[in-house]
Amino acid sequence: MSILITRPSPAGEQLTQRLIDAGKHAFHAPLIEIAAGKELSILENKLNKLSTGDYLFLLSKNAVWYANWQLNQLQQSWPDTLFYYGIGQSTAEEFQQLTAHSIRYPEFGETSEDLLALSSLQQIENKRVLLLRGNGGRELLATTLRQRGAIVDECECYQRLFIDYVSEEFALKWKNAQVEYLCGHQCEMLQQLLSSRWI
């Protein structure tokens, strides 16, 4: 019996190693890789459009990492005049560790619905909002903030790129490893897996 870990690097390798250390048979075959987003180079311009009291949303740890990396490359710092929001606790903690800025996030849950339920986001009419995100994903947050009267802009800080394995080789590896369990964390990865010929 073996467990197939499909999470991207480095989290996938870390999870695989923890399972092996716990005495489980596991192997890592990520279905996506994470790369810099198509709009990362214009992040600074988008930040400069925000004014004191505007809102900046960080929608994943990858968005935090790539945005922070870009600002460091430009020798720029995060503005201290904005309200920062994280999609959840892990994203917020990543941001706080890298920047030392305070950031708000839902006490429970890590979804757009949880974030939108915060009382401080109910009255945001005419406020500028910048969403730092990856490619694809849900539009609920942007749509709802616009419905509440916010002026919403987005910046694709990172992108998820599907890895195209050679079907026959991967099918043989999966069979030889006697995979019985699959560990993933996003619906789009499961769809990619199910659409492949090697399962």
Swiss-Prot record:
The keyword Transmembrane does not apply. Pathway: Porphyrin-containing compound metabolism; protoporphyrin-IX biosynthesis; coproporphyrinogen-III from 5-aminolevulinate: step 3/4. InterPro entries: 4pyrrol_syn_uPrphyn_synt_sf, 4pyrrol_synth_uPrphyn_synth, UROS/Hem4. One of its GO terms (biological process) is uroporphyrinogen III biosynthetic process. Signal peptide: none annotated. It catalyses: hydroxymethylbilane = uroporphyrinogen III + H2O. This is Uroporphyrinogen-III synthase. The gene is hemD.
